[in-house]
């Protein structure tokens, strides 16, 4: 969250609401009935954490309202009734959800004006394009969204229910095979950090696996909050490999490369060349080292042999949806 015209968000925090597991444990601490974002994160040991956004779509509106309240009053420190608001939504977000979002903004927060933009379209704007295909992968969902001259093509949007949270879960599982045990919601957050700091995508998975068996070159160590040090090797690239091989976690779905290709194939034959040449990655789950090269290699193998393939992974892609929103909302034509 932040202000139009800024080049980066003022506030970045997870969409988590935490409630105390046992009431009255912290006597005299002025205990709240709910904690949001980083505070929920830091007190996770005594809380039960809930994620009101599932697969990119809001499923718990009471908790979502708490998150928005926290955003306006605690993070941005603004009166919502004094500022027009730009919200973003997942592609193919149900119309009822958009209406509910609008209702809460006008009725609960009294915003003077609001607009809801599709996330992937904003990412494309942020990359300086108006035509291309965006592969956006966050915590709960991934989408491939072909966009032509600023408009998303809804018939060709594909959704893949595989994203950051699944990778974290998979890493928890394969670390267990190594003899490390991570099970609680609090421990999941530790594993997420391991994933973000140490994982990478192999250009050639099988070859990387062979290398890791004979050499310790891929091994890295990580210090847990309690001071214990764990060693992680092949898990580093086995974890995000799931993006290209969902069958590894028992999912019958196409990987992100094939989903992108399928999305392009659903578009008019005349615009495919423009899409192949402008494949834009966005979202936190595209932050792995090696992802652009691997994506390029895999799509080149699927596409017609003469086709020019270009995969763009902008350095700011973790926040490119927000940056695109900042650009859009600061245009005078848009404000009118």
UniProtKB/Swiss-Prot annotation:
Pfam families listed in its UniProt record: Actin (PF00022)
Subcellular location: Cytoplasm, Cytoskeleton
E.C. number(s) listed in UniProt: 3.6.4.-
SUPFAM superfamilies: Actin-like ATPase domain
GO terms for MF: ATP binding; hydrolase activity
SMART domains xref list: ACTIN (SM00268)
PROSITE patterns from the UniProt entry: ACTINS_1, ACTINS_ACT_LIKE
Reactions performed catalytically: ATP + H2O = ADP + phosphate + H(+)
Class of the enzyme per the UniProt entry, highest EC level: hydrolase
Keywords assigned: ATP-binding, Cytoplasm, Cytoskeleton, Hydrolase, Nucleotide-binding
Origin: domain of life: Eukaryota
Any single Gene Ontology cellular-component annotation: actin cytoskeleton
CDD domains the record matches: ASKHA_NBD_actin (cd10224)
Recorded family membership: Belongs to the actin family.
Note: There are at least 13 actin genes in potato.
Function of the molecule: Actins are highly conserved proteins that are involved in various types of cell motility and are ubiquitously expressed in all eukaryotic cells. Essential component of cell cytoskeleton; plays an important role in cytoplasmic streaming, cell shape determination, cell division, organelle movement and extension growth.
Record protein name field: Actin-82
Species per Swiss-Prot/TrEMBL record: Solanum tuberosum (Potato)
């Amino acid at each position: 969250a932040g202000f139009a015209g800024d080049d980066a968000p003022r506030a970045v925090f997870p969409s988590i609401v935490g409630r105390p597991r046992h009431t009255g444990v912290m006597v005299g601490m002025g205990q709240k009935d709910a904690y949001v974002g980083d505070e929920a994160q830091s007190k996770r040991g005594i809380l039960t954490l809930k994620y009101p956004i599932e697969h990119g779509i809001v499923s718990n509106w009471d908790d979502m309202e708490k998150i928005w309240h926290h955003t306006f009053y605690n993070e941005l420190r603004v009166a919502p009734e004094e500022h027009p608001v730009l919200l973003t939504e997942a592609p193919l977000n149900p119309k009822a959800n958009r209406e509910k979002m609008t209702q809460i903004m006008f009725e609960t927060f009294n915003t003077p004006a609001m607009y809801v933009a599709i996330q992937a379209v904003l990412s494309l704007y942020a990359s300086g394009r108006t035509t291309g295909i965006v592969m956006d992968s966050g915590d709960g969902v991934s989408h491939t969204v072909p966009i032509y001259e600023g408009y998303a093509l809804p018939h060709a949007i594909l959704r893949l229910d595989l994203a950051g949270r699944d990778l974290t879960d998979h890493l928890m599982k394969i670390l267990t095979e190594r003899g490390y045990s991570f099970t609680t919601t609090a421990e999941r957050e530790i594993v997420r950090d391991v994933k973000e700091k140490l994982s990478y995508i192999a250009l050639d998975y099988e070859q990387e696996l062979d290398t890791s068996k004979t050499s310790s070159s891929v091994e890295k160590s990580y210090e847990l909050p309690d001071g214990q040090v764990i060693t992680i090797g092949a898990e580093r690239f086995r974890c995000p490999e799931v993006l290209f091989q969902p069958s590894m976690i028992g999912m019958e779905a196409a990987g992100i490369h094939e989903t992108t290709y399928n999305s392009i194939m659903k578009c008019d034959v005349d615009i495919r060349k423009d899409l192949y040449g402008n494949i834009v990655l966005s979202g936190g789950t595209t932050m792995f080292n090696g992802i652009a090269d691997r994506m390029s290699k895999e799509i080149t193998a699927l596409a017609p042999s003469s086709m020019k393939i270009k995969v763009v992974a902008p350095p700011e892609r973790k926040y490119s949806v927000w940056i695109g929103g900042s650009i859009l909302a600061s245009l005078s034509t848009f404000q009118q």
